[in-house]
A protein has these predicted regions:
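C-terminal outer-membrane beta-barrel translocator/porin domains of Gram-negative envelope proteins
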Residues: 269, 307, 407-561, 566-570, ...
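Outer-membrane beta-barrel "beta-signal"
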Residues: 438, 592-596, 600-601, 617-628
Length: 628
């Protein structure tokens, strides 16, 4: 031990005290320490901290059209007129000064300025201090472009860049306008033969004396290009032979990025890729027209080819109907799908298998072959049917809704059906062999496949058929349908439908009941049961006819994802080969719609207006898609 001051010579030092036991004790292990931080004054917060109120005033931005934009971004306004204290109000006001200046510069007021002022209203008994925050903006002069210069090499046509650049001398130096003009060049260039066009950094030289700005933009156009070949990489789903079915361009055609996007969309629509990219690649090959051939690199990655699907519906007279499907979209590559379908309903049961080749040698052309067994039991007839069919079709798709579509094919059907024999006065069962060549042509001038809002559609079905039941009887089934859609407003669509059908060359009683025409149901005249319209037997059951006419009008009102649809339908089926137009049956009702990405879900309730004996007072229909 030592002392602070030395002891005088000859003095005796005091003995050293015994050690304090606390100092010699072992240290507490680190794990035993309490690590909770000590509370400080700054940490103690009042559950009800004092608040001040303030009002916000903006001045000077209305005349340049920026007041609304400033208000939507203002820190003062976003604070809701409340702050912890006056210092916070002042800090928000400073933020809003800078905001006003940024907005002014964005539309060409580069000398713009803004100041803020905070005024306090003296408190009165029972009334706390209230502040008034005022931000005053001074726009200053508007800067305009004195010149516009695009620096690039030669292009074809020579005005390709200038004609598609929406800036000219005298325009205000407005950020959004400049960015939009530059973006347009990046769109137009690849659409017109320049897939590698790049925009450099713009330069705007301001002159505060004028006040103007000289605008310069470097543009690297790259080579003018034409389409070359398709090449592929990755885990291939399709080989080059099938890939070359999809392009809507030919080798040597001037490059257009829209056609590249279309190719990518068409490949994605097959549903067979987990990822896919289509990118132009320089080749250095020069074509006869001086353009460089650009190959398209298709990088593929396989996706899951199998899927399960299902639909459900209900309608008066048809009951519940459930359908489930299993699909392997690429079992027989390329795009050879196997589809197994099972129908389970209160009045219909069936099983079918379909082979479908999509994009069969031509884009959007489909070949399908189906084998199906079905049992159905309705008031009109019951039938046990086996069908073999094949069909070629040219279809619309979500990425290309075609004006003209069609299908044609062949069908062989064996069916055992019950029918009412008027000569015997009772129901009997007969077996029919039917061969048919069904065809359909549709002209579509509507704006949407699933939920049209304007335009019209015309559809013609013709099916030459032969029926063998004792002897062979040839005949022709025809159907003509037209629909029209008119947009009254953004939320109201008027829709109408007319349909007429005729069967020529055979007597009704020689025709299999399943091939006759019937009226009534969700896709026909709502308010009446499925197949209930037309001639009846003595028991009041429908027997069908050789002709049909129908009409419908709907008002489709939509609000958000929901809709209400009042409607009126009319129609009937007749024993004669041509519809008479007499004895029309009318139904009216109202429906609800829930709109989804794959079409509207429909619930319709209808009542017959001139009901017959045995007709229900109310009919209900549930399904996907509009009625027409």
């Amino acid at each position: 031990a030592t002392t602070t001051n030395p002891a005088p010579t000859g003095d005796t030092l005091a003995p050293i005290a015994a050690a304090d036991p606390a100092l010699t004790a072992p240290l507490t292990p680190l794990a035993g320490f309490d690590t909770t931080p000590l509370a400080t004054a700054a940490d103690i917060q009042d559950k009800n901290p004092p608040q001040v109120r303030y009002d916000t005033v903006i001045d000077g931005l209305e005349k340049v059209g920026l007041a609304a934009q400033w208000k939507s971004l203002s820190a003062l306004r976003n604070g809701g007129g409340k702050a912890a204290n006056g210092v916070q109000v002042q800090a928000r006001a400073k933020e809003d000064e800078a905001l006003a200046v940024r907005l002014l510069k964005s539309i060409g007021y580069y000398d713009g300025s803004a100041v803020s002022a905070i005024e306090a209203t003296p408190p009165t008994p029972g009334t706390p201090t209230r502040y008034k925050a005022t931000v005053t903006a001074t726009p200053g002069p508007l800067y305009n472009l004195s010149s516009v210069t695009l620096q690039s090499g030669p292009v074809t046509p020579t005005d390709l860049l200038t004609a598609n650049f929406a800036l000219k001398a005298g325009d205000p130096i407005e950020a959004a306008r400049i960015q939009g003009a530059e973006a347009n060049l990046q769109i137009v260039g690849p659409h017109q033969g320049y897939p590698f066009l790049k925009i450099g950094d713009r330069d705007v030289l301001l002159d505060d004396k004028t006040p103007t700005g000289a605008y310069t933009l470097p543009v690297d156009t790259g080579p003018r290009a034409s389409f070359g070949r398709l090449v592929t990489a990755g885990d291939p789903v399709f080989g080059l032979d099938h890939l070359n079915v999809f392009p809507r361009f030919k080798e040597g055609q001037l490059y257009d990025s829209g056609k590249t996007d279309d190719l990518r969309d068409a490949l994605n629509a097959t549903g067979l890729f987990s990822s896919l990219s289509v990118q132009p690649q320089r080749t250095g090959r020069t074509g006869p027209d001086g353009t460089e051939a650009v190959d398209l690199l298709v990088t593929q990655a396989k996706g899951p080819p199998r899927s399960l699907g299902g639909t459900a519906g209900y309608s008066t007279g048809q009951g519940f109907r459930l359908e489930g499907t299993y699909t392997h979209r690429n079992l027989f590559a390329p795009e050879g799908a196997l589809i197994a379908s099972l129908v389970a309903g209160t009045q219909e049961q069936g099983l079918s298998g379909t082979f479908r080749r999509s994009n069969a040698g031509k884009r959007d052309r489909t070949f399908s072959a189906t084998a199906a067994a079905n049992h159905s039991s309705y008031d009109a007839f019951s039938a046990d049917t086996f069908t073999l069919s094949a069909r070629w079709s040219y279809d619309s798709t979500p990425i290309w809704q075609k004006r003209l579509t069609y299908y044609y094919g062949g069908e062989l059907t064996g069916t055992n059906e019950s029918m009412y024999d008027f000569a015997r006065g009772e129901r009997v069962r007969r077996t029919y062999g039917i061969a048919a060549l069904p065809t359909q042509f549709q002209f579509d001038h509507s704006d949407d496949l699933l939920n049209p809002t304007k335009g019209y559609r015309l559809r013609l079905n013709v099916s030459p058929e032969g029926s063998i039941q004792g002897s062979a009887r040839p005949y022709v089934r025809t159907m003509l349908e037209g629909t029209m859609y008119k947009s009254v407003s953004s939320s109201l669509i008027l829709a109408g439908r007319l349909r007429a059908g005729s069967i020529l060359g055979i007597d009704r009683d020689d025709l299999a009941p399943s091939r006759r025409y019937y009226g009534g149901g969700g896709g026909s005249v709502r308010g009446y049961g499925f197949q209930r319209l037309g001639p009846l037997d003595p028991n009041g059951d429908p027997v069908g006819g050789r002709s049909l006419n129908e009409g419908a009008v709907e008002a489709r009102y939509r609000f958000g994802n929901f809709g209400i649809v009042p409607f009126i339908d009319a129609g009937n089926a007749y024993e004669s080969s041509f519809p008479k137009g007499s004895d029309l049956r009318f139904g009216a009702g109202i429906g609800g719609r829930f709109y989804t990405n794959f079409g509207p879900f429909r619930i319709d309730a209808a009542t017959p207006l001139n009901k017959r004996k045995g007709d229900s007072k109310l009919a209900l229909y549930l399904s996907l898609g509009q009625a027409f």
